[in-house]
């Protein structure tokens, strides 16, 4: 990105440092940048370790998508006969693939090579020490470069005791005019990346998950039971632990004692429409108001692009936000979690900026941080939501009995959750109580109007009356144990939080049917708890742990967010019932949609830019002309009817799996009432064609300026 290599001594010009109401402002080096991702730029490398020569071929490695965490995998190729160099192919892990050290050593031995595992591991570590790079985009490259030029010119003019002639000053004025023209021109390249970053994104690969009871006694249920892909769905139920090995298909239709067409024992088994694409429209037609019938939306996307694309549709619809962002610790978690403080602040600030438009006026946000970043997070949250809207700092005391002693400091047994209102005056807060270990006796009191004070209630004998109390108001220190490694609730995600913790947050800040958002969904705990508490929910997450299953940081198969939510709907599985299920009497049921969003890297790969002459406009300075006016970008998906003066969009030319109905819903900022093969109908009655969508609505998706 375009920005200063070394932090400047002066303060930035984008905001005043001193104002009438603020004398402390948080500054960080990358504040003017959009954070894209952190990645290593691996290049092919010759290495010599303990006298053994290695060559690592990284030519086929592609950059990661956004900020997902992926392991590097090595495969032995050959021994070069001329000098004995061991050649390895290097790639990012796909579908849980790992480096098999024993197999590599055997293959090297077969190829007449000599090597031990210690030397091999050393060589791998040397290769992986290649530079890690943070990728950014400057939000306003023109303003930044002009500022830097002004500072350079000022320092040049006033350094030392120089006396400037009129001719020299004229030269400097000419230099400034030329520099500004060059800046106007080159900043357009960075600005184009900003436009791609912020452009609305296509919805792709969408499916619905709903429990069998939602289909009732409809004809769709019969079609489902005879569908050729039903065995694949049954295998998924088995993999998620919802049914046993002895389950047979006929058990689904076996009538129970009440004579229902669906056996009650299996009424909450979840159907994923990815197996039944030919029945999807038939299923959706069963709902009079589709989006209103959904319990939630699960979005596979980098969080900023997800929030940016969803901002219009979910504007002022979120009652409560809980996020558990990367803590900036550098530990080996299931996502990248090792940032410089400036990078971490940019990662979080760009997303927080979008949340204010999503929250209702009565809404709240809870940000979960630990010791490595909470001091920065508090100031950042004050900047975005205002110090006057700070409500509390909740201390989650999770006491770990395995915490080591004698480490030169007090054992660390808590984390902070910062609680802010969008608007303190209008905020809705619902106090909670917590049970006491032992009943407590409290004096019964009343307000004595005559004496204008509180008095104790006394019986006829003049004795003070006591009431037995079994619970007390919940304060800001929450004593909730951390999930143990053997807990049924734990899905294999390292930073997973207990449902009991999230339950307190949701109950204190929302009512049933109101919506909860988590845009760092992680293991899906927020979404799971929201479903069990009968709230609507919206979750955003990127990476392989989005799916039914994934390979975690320990190299083990683990349940992903999608799989966990399916178990929640079923009310049973490898991990369910667990958490708050018993106390909430949760047995299952539900309906949600999941999909992925087109990502920044997808657009970079698909957009077409040509090395051509600039478009000549006789009425405009060429330095200010839009450099990319001639470029197709993604217009190869559009067919122009010159006679009819119309543009026809063909989504299949871009991606094979675009969900046009959801894409249009996000573009229009409207909830879907009904979807047919020909059109999508919104809740306000507007209909939009799916066979020939409105060009003006589609245009920003394929051509931006």
Where are these regions (language model features)?
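Conserved SAM-binding loop
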Residues: 299, 366-367, 519, 539
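Short acidic, glycine/proline-rich loop/turn micro-motifs
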Residues: 332-337, 404, 487-491
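Conserved SAM-binding loop and adjacent beta-strand
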Residues: 488-501
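Short, glycine/acidic-enriched loop or turn micro-motifs at the edges of active sites
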Residues: 305, 327, 373, 521, ...
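Accessory, often C-terminal, charged low-complexity segments
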Residues: 1-290, 295, 311-319, 352-356, ...
């Amino acid at each position: 990105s375009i920005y200063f290599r070394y932090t400047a001594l002066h303060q930035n010009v984008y905001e005043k440092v001193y104002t009438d109401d603020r004398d402390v402002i948080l500054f960080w080096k990358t504040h003017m940048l959009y954070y894209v991702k952190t990645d290593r730029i691996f290049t092919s490398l010759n290495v010599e370790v303990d006298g053994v020569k290695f060559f690592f071929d990284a030519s086929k490695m592609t950059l990661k998508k956004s900020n997902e965490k992926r392991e590097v995998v090595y495969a032995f190729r050959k021994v070069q006969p001329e000098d004995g160099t061991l050649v390895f192919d290097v790639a990012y892990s796909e579908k849980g693939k790992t480096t098999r050290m024993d197999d590599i050593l055997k293959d090297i031995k077969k190829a007449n090579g000599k090597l031990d595992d210690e030397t091999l591991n050393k060589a791998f570590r040397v290769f992986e020490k290649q530079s890690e790079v943070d990728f950014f985009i400057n939000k306003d490259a023109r303003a930044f470069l002009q500022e830097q030029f002004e500072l350079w010119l000022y320092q040049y003019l006033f350094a030392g005791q120089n006396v400037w002639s009129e001719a020299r000053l004229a030269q400097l004025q000419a230099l400034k005019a030329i520099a500004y023209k060059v800046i106007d021109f080159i900043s357009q390249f960075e600005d184009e990346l900003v436009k791609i970053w912020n452009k609305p994104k296509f919805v792709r690969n969408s499916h619905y998950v709903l429990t069998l009871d939602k289909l009732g006694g409809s004809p769709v249920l019969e079609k489902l039971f005879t569908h050729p892909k039903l065995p694949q769905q049954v295998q998924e139920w088995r993999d998620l632990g919802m049914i046993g090995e002895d389950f047979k298909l006929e058990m689904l239709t076996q009538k129970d004692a009440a004579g229902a067409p669906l056996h009650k024992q299996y009424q909450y088994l979840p159907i994923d429409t990815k197996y039944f694409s030919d029945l999807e429209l038939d299923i959706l037609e069963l709902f009079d108001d589709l989006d209103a019938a959904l319990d939630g939306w699960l979005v596979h996307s980098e969080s900023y692009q997800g929030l940016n694309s969803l901002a219009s549709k979910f504007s002022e619809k979120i009652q409560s936000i809980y996020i558990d962002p990367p803590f900036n610790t550098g530990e080996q978690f299931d996502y990248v979690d090792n940032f410089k403080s400036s990078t971490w602040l940019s990662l979080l600030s760009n997303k927080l900026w979008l949340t204010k438009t999503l929250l209702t006026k009565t809404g709240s946000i809870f940000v979960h941080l630990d010791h490595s970043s909470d001091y920065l997070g508090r100031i950042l949250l004050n900047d975005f939501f205002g110090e006057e809207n700070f409500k509390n700092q909740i201390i989650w005391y999770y006491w770990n009995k395995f915490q080591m002693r004698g480490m030169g400091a007090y054992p660390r047994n808590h984390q902070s959750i910062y609680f802010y209102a969008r608007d303190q005056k209008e905020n809705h807060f619902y106090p909670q109580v917590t049970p006491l270990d032992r009943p407590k006796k409290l004096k019964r009191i009343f307000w004595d109007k005559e004496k204008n004070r509180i008095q104790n209630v006394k019986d006829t004998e003049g004795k003070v009356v006591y009431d037995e109390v079994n619970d007390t108001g919940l304060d800001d220190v929450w004593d909730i144990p951390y999930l143990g490694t053997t807990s049924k609730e734990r899905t294999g995600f390292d930073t997973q939080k207990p449902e009991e913790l999230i339950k307190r947050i949701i109950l204190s800040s929302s009512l049933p049917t109101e919506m909860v958002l988590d845009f760092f969904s992680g293991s899906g705990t927020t979404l799971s708890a929201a479903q069990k508490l009968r709230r609507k929910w919206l979750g955003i997450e990127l990476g392989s742990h989005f799916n039914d299953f994934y390979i975690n940081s320990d190299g083990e198969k683990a349940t992903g967010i999608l799989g966990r939510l399916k178990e929640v709907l079923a009310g049973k599985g490898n991990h369910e019932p667990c958490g708050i299920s018993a106390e909430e009497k949760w047995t299952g049921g539900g309906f949600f949609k999941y999909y992925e969003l087109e990502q920044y890297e997808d657009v970079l790969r698909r957009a077409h830019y040509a090395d051509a002459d600039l478009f000549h406009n006789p009425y405009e300075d060429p330095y200010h002309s839009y450099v990319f006016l001639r470029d197709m970008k993604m217009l190869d998906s559009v067919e122009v009817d010159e006679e009819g003066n119309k543009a026809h969009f063909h989504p299949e030319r871009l991606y094979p799996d675009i969900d046009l109905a959801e894409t249009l819903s996000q573009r229009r900022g409207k909830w879907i009432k009904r979807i047919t093969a020909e059109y999508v109908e919104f809740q306000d009655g507007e209909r939009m064609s799916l066979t020939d969508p409105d060009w003006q609505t589609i245009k920003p998706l394929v051509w931006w300026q």
